Amino acid sequence: MVSTPSPKTKVYLLEQRKNQELNIEHIDEEMRLEQVRQAASKMEWTSFGQAVRRNLLEKRNTIDADGRIDVLNGIAYMKTKMPIEENNLMEEKIRVMAESLGCLHKQTSRGWSINRQEDLIMDFTVNDGEVTTVVLSFWEEPSFYSPEATRMLQLGMWTELRNRISDMLLTYDKLLSRDDRRNCMGAMRMLEMLFGHFSQDPSYTSIHRSNYGFYLPRNDLRAGRVYYLAEPHFRNIRSKDHIFQLQKDDHEVLPYFEFSFAKHDSPCTLPEFDTKGWAESIEANAVICMKLSRGFNLTETTRKKLGAISAKTPSVKHFTNSYRYVTGAVKIENNLQMITQFGDGQTQHFYNVDVNQLRNDGDSVITEIYLKHLQDFHEIIAILRNEAMHISLWESMISACYEKQGMKKHTVAAIKMDVFLTREQIVITFDTKFAPVKVVIQDSGVCEAKVNVVHAQTGLQIAEKIDETLSRKLNETWSIPNMLTYAVSGSDCNLAKIKVPLRSENPETVGPIPTYAAGRSF
């Protein structure tokens, strides 16, 4: 039976939800009803809280299951990154730290304890409201006193300590089974032993050339690191101060990677050490992960090469064009033209790069590499070093062409050069008074480049001695503009008159970023 409403009664017809799509009309009616509910009750905080809670409970059913999971994951992630306010009470700081690490916490006779089963135990001794000692235990290993953690808390660096603890816990994937993690921990001890034995030389040359780089052992709050690259320019700068070995202030400057273990869908073999040496004899649903300290700019060709010897595809941060990415430009419409900034009176190089070489976005910036077999480690290191050299050679051209802000307009004499970029080779062609010349740069070994100078039309070698000289200069500096000054001079060519600066915009914001001024963090 349907009752007939009185003429003065307003009837709201609420649409029944038929699907999970957002219904604006329904939400609007709900808001109107909520206003009526609040007006009918005393407006005090308790009543207001009850009304809001009731409203939220009604709305909760409109979120689908996937949406709820996304929301919960988002909240959990935000909790791990929430800052810990230094001015909060001790109990509040302990609570926030524990929650952000996914731990339980409790008060003890000495202070506080934070615990996550099988992963972490942190015991704090507190006197007069200040932390006096911090004792740590990771992955059920023996507990130890951490001077660094104690110092950080005494300086009020609660958030920084939490972040470093969180990074340590990433060593073993939380999805690993107990048995797999135990096998991974054994493999980690073997890796530490192996690298501790074969990478003891901290010299920059050894870091750059050794098959194992240099291993910096794990400490209280940092995983072990393998440093694998020290570019010639960096070594030259340090040598001016008579420094030839890795220093503490180099730890965050030079590229490195850390070992960790990630869950894998299928069993992989892990290294084990016995009296006969090490062998890959243990199986686990886990894979050795080489976590790079910063994004690594990788061409598509090299990524495929890495994939052939990896347990799975390297983790890609984003896809890009490696050569355009280094310039700092999101998009380049026309041919890229740059001119060197050599000293006054010197002949400049005017580089022209075909825009088509800067458009393909099949390259990538990667963050992690997954080892299939430990014996392939040295091959992966060689691939990374050669790739770093290739990208640095291109960076050297951009760096040499950086136009400083406030440059007055003037005309310079320059040699016009066309640049062709591929992963296999970098080709630079230009005309001289005697013949058209082509300079071809290719990899010849680990962190070694080979330069061939040939006739651009016939392909005949100009002179073997020139090739040797240019190869040596390029490997000493990793600088193509510097190398080219030994290949050609202004008197050998018909020079063009170029008006500079080439760009009318502020080069500090839109121009190519110099490699050594901005660093190589991707």
UniProtKB/Swiss-Prot annotation:
It comes from Caenorhabditis elegans. Signal peptide: none annotated. Keywords: Activator, Coiled coil, Nucleus, Transcription, Transcription regulation. Residues 13-40 form a coiled coil. GO terms for cellular component: nucleus. Belongs to the Mediator complex subunit 1 family. The keyword Secreted does not apply. It is found in: Nucleus. This is Mediator of RNA polymerase II transcription subunit 1.2. Its main location: nucleus. Component of the Mediator complex, a coactivator involved in the regulated transcription of nearly all RNA polymerase II-dependent genes. Mediator functions as a bridge to convey information from gene-specific regulatory proteins to the basal RNA polymerase II transcription machinery. Mediator is recruited to promoters by direct interactions with regulatory proteins and serves as a scaffold for the assembly of a functional preinitiation complex with RNA polymerase II and the general transcription factors. The gene is mdt-1.2. Component of the Mediator complex. Disulfide bonds: none annotated.
